């Protein structure tokens, strides 16, 4: 009986150690011009699981990534990268994260990260006040994800 308990404990420890190895890294490029127009994240819709990392890469100069106030899951920490620097975000909280390029937000440069299934805060993000061009691009991003 004791050997069985030890084997289960060892299996549990191995499973916990292997979990980070299963995490995915998703690259997102920050571009002056992309398939969807000017000032874009590609992809603009990112599907991730808790524990995954999202690496934002400023392919063109002048970009960063920043969380938008009240448009990330409850319990998630806000973040902001420096201009022209790669930024690695580990997503831990399930839900939707709306992010922006700070200098180009007024031009609609946003991306949506959906962590887990059916992000609970997506309706809140969609209905929140934001510039018209941002709302239009967000609606396109959501439609492309379906």
From Swiss-Prot:
Coiled coil: none annotated. SUPFAM superfamilies: Cupredoxins (SSF49503). It holds the Pfam family Copper-bind. Residues 1-23 form the signal peptide. It comes from the Bacteria. The keyword rRNA processing does not apply. It is found in: Periplasm. GO terms for molecular function: copper ion binding; electron transfer activity. Its cofactor is Cu cation. Binds 1 copper ion per subunit. Induction: Under anaerobic growth conditions and by nitrite. The keyword Cell division does not apply. InterPro entries: Amicyanin/Pseudoazurin, BlueCu_1, BlueCu_1_BS, Copper_blue_Plastocyanin, Cupredoxin, Pseudoazurin. Residues 28-116 form the Plastocyanin-like domain. Its main location: periplasm. This soluble electron transfer copper protein is required for the inactivation of copper-containing nitrite reductase in the presence of oxygen. Serves as a direct electron donor to the nitrite reductase. This is Pseudoazurin. It comes from Alcaligenes faecalis.
């Amino acid at each position: 009986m004791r050997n069985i308990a030890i084997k289960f404990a060892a299996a549990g420890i191995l499973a916990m150690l292997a979990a980070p190895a299963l995490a995915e890294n998703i690259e997102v490029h920050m571009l002056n011009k992309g398939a969807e127009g000017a000032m874009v994240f590609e992809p603009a819709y990112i599907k991730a699981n808790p524990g995954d990392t999202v690496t934002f890469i400023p392919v063109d100069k002048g970009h960063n990534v920043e969380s938008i106030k009240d448009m990330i899951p409850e319990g998630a920490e806000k973040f902001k990268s420096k201009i022209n620097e790669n930024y690695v975000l580990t997503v831990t909280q399930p839900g939707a994260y709306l992010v922006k390029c700070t200098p180009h937000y007024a031009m609609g440069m946003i991306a949506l990260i959906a962590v887990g299934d059916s992000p609970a805060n997506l309706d809140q993000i969609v209905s929140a006040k934001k510039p018209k061009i941002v709302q239009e691009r967000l609606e396109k991003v959501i439609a492309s994800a379906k």
